[in-house]
Amino acid sequence: MNYIELSVFIAYFVFMVAIGLYFFSKSKGAGEKDYFLGGRNMGAWVSALSAGASDMSAWVLMGLPASIYLSGMGQTWIAIGLGIGYAVSWIFMAPRLRRFSIAANDSITIPQYLTNRFLSKNRSLQILSAIIFLVAYTIYAASSIKACGTLFNTVMDIDPTVAMYIAAFIIVAYTFLGGFSAVCWTDFFQGMIMLAALLIAPLFALALAKAGDGAATGAALPEGFFNFFTTPQDIISGLGWGLGYFGMPHIIIRFMSLKSEKELRKSSVIGISWTTIILIMSALTAIAGRLYLGEIEDSSTVFITMVRRIFPALVSGLLLSAILSAAMSTADSQLLAASSAFASDVYKPVIRKKASDSEMLWAGRIVVIVIAVVALMIASDPNSGSIMGLVENAWGVFGAAFGPVILLSLFWKRLTFGGTVAGIAAGAAVDILWLVFLSSTDIYEIVPGFAAGLLAAVVVSLLSKGPGKDVEDLFDRAVDLKS
C-alpha cells in the first residue's frame, strides 16, 4: 500500500464532503427547486464542467482506453459518436429545453416537464418515467461505484468491496447534504482534475516511449491498430452512442439549471471544448499505453499502470484521483436525478400530494441512500458484468426511451401526450428486448430502440386527436421566450 497516494485520496474525499457541508449550511429555507435544480442560478463554467464530468464517467479513463488498447482505433467510433451527440445537444437542444421547461410551469425534472408540456393532470407519464429512472440509474450508479473499487484494489491493494463501500459513503454524504449545487461544484473541480490528468499522463508516456526511456518496452503497435473502418456494426453502434445525449436526464438537466441564455451560450462553448479534448486524450491514452507499456494483463488499468510507472507517488496520487473524479461526478448526478424523480414525480403527486418543500427534500435524501445501497449490492456482485457493460446498458435505455420524445417535444408541435407515453414505452421495450435476444447482431441496442421510440411517438400522435390550442400556445410561448 502506498501511503502517499492514500493520503492524497483522503484529502480529496475530505474536500468533496466539505463542499457538501458548505451547501448544506446554506440550505436553510431552500425549496425543491433549490435542492434539485440549484434554483436555476448556475453559471457557465460550473454548468459546462458539471455536465461534462457527470457525463464522462470512469469509463473515459478506464473503459474507452481499454477498448481501444485491445481492439484498435476502430473503437474510436464511440468517441466520435459521443462528440457529435454532445455538440448537437448543447447547440440545438439546450436553449429550447431551458425555455420549454420554464414555460411548462417551471418544471424541475424531465418527467415533470414531459407532463407539464401537455398541461396534463394525468400522472401516468410522470410515473412511468420515474420508474425507468430509478431502475436505470441504479444500474448506472453501480458502474461508477465499481470503478472506485477497481481503482483502490489496483492502487492500494484494498479489497474491492471495502473500497466500494468507502466510495459510496463519500458520494452519498455530499449529495445527501448539498443537493444540486454541491453536486455541480464538486463536478466542476472533478472536471478540472480529469482534464489535467488526461492532458499530462499520455503525453508524458509518449515522450518517454519515443526517447527510449528505460521504463518503456519499445513495443510496437499491433498490426491493423489504426484501421478505423472495421465492420459496419462497429461504426453504426459507435455513432449510435451519440443518440444517448438527447435522453440522458442527469446531463440535460444542467441545461435547465443555467441562469440565462447568455450563460448558456458561453457554457456550450466551454462544454463542447472540454468534452472534445477529453475524448481525444482518452484515445491517446490507449496509444500511449500500447507504446509505453506493451502488453498488460488487465487493459482497464492502462491509465493507472502508466501513471504509477511514470510519476512519483504524490503526483500519481493526484492524477489517479481523476478516476475517482470521473466515477464520483457521474454517480452523484445519477443519485440526485433518481432522487428528484422519486420525490417530485412519485412522492408528491401520488403518495403525499400536500408534502411541504422540507418534506420533499428529505424524501429525496432518503432515496439517495436507498439507491446507493442497491447500486452497491449490484457493483459488489461478481456476476454484475464489466464497468463498460453496465454503462452501455443504462445509456441505451435512457437514450432509447427519452431521447426521441424529448426532441419531438421541443421541435414538433403536433406531438401528443399519448404519443409521448408510446414513445417512451416502445423505446425502452425494444432496447431491452434487443439486448436480451438480438445482441449477437453486434448492433448497439440504442439504435433500434431510438428508432422504435421515434416511430411510435410520431405514429400514435398522428393517429390521435391533436393537442389543444392551450398546448399549442404553450409551445409558441416557449419558442419565443427570452430569459
Identify the residue ranges that each predicted region occupies.
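Membrane-embedded helix-loop-helix hairpins and adjacent transmembrane boundary segments
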Residues: 1-483
